[in-house]
Amino acid sequence: MGYRILTLNQISVRGLERFPRDRYEVASSLAHPDAILLRSADLHSVEIAPSVLAVGRAGAGTNNVPVAALSKRGVPVFNAPGANSNAVKELVIASLFLAARNICQAWDFARGLSGDDKTIDEATEKGKKSFAGFELPGRTLGVIGLGAIGVEVANAAERLGMRVIGYDPDITVQRAWQLSASIEQARSLDELFSRSQFVTVHIPLVEGTRGLVNSTRLQLMPE
């Protein structure tokens, strides 16, 4: 008899192909599953069947999984740290460009133009300076959490010419070796916020990190 795997989210076909059908039954609706595979579904709010022997999350964080409760039951929780690090890095860098160069506002402005070519040209010349923004080289990015994602973000921003400050009191030796030597270390969160024009956070949302970014710390950031 094969193992029964309950999927609670859409999982990549390439990932599911790793479970041969002659040994595994994989479905989004199963009674008495041996394992649960999920992405963003919140396991805190559902009853986990006594038959479950393992839980796997297709992602890095496990804040949507009751790890402590499952550990007491002897149920291991597996995750995939770093699996989405490049995708997240690209989105963070894209967000920096969006914020610095007023791209969304310029897009809305351009879509709102109407009239003949002469009218549009005149409106463009008159309005385009409002969206110039500023360039990223020389600006400071604070990175909170230097795991797989944080390190990639920090290194990418540094290659863009940004000054990068990192904060992670629990950084591993492996991640430290991967980090560019030019990345500066912040001794505290308050120091990081007070020196950064942009801040990006790459740590799990748990009770110990909830409220880490707050109005008091945001007010420390330079104008």
Where are these regions (language model features)?
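An N-terminal-biased, well-structured beta-alpha scaffold segment characteristic
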Residues: 1-80, 194, 214
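Structural/interface elements that position substrates and couple domains in central-metabolism enzymes
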Residues: 3-6, 10-14, 21-26, 85-87, ...
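Rossmann-like adenosine-cofactor binding region
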Residues: 44-46, 169-223
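Phosphate-binding beta-alpha-beta segment of Rossmann-like dinucleotide-binding domains, i.e.
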Residues: 81-140
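Glycine-rich Rossmann-fold phosphate-binding loop(s) that bind the pyrophosphate
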Residues: 146-147
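N-terminal Rossmann-fold NAD(P) dinucleotide-binding loop
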Residues: 150-151
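Conserved S-adenosyl-L-methionine
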Residues: 159-163
